[in-house]
Amino acid sequence: MNLLLDTHAVLWWLSDDPTLSEAARVAISDPENTVYLSAVVIWEMRIKQGIGKLDLPDDFEEVVDGQAFSKLPVTVDHANAIVRLPAIHRDPFDRMLVAQAVVEEMTIVTRDRNIAEYGIDVVVA
């Protein structure tokens, strides 16, 4: 299974936060699954860090690079897919994650109920 991690799922995974569901932990740690980290997630984190809404460790890049995540860039196909999404979610970061999941046929690991309304596969974070 190809998994795409939502921002909170990444943060919970990296900090070993007990908020992350057992189903998500099993899916992320399963060597049969490929776990993707979108540039959108890093972008959102860095914006929040820059405005003081998120504290990240100084070695954040090294921590992320130490994970077995495959990196997913944003492509023109992803951007074009936004127009085909129903107006369920207003958050541009989440809409782009949904577009990426649709284009790349991925399952999103998220706690966001709005994302499930798009009819895509979700592992509850």
Give the label of every model feature segment.
Residues 45:
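Phosphate/NTP-binding elements of NTP-utilizing enzymes
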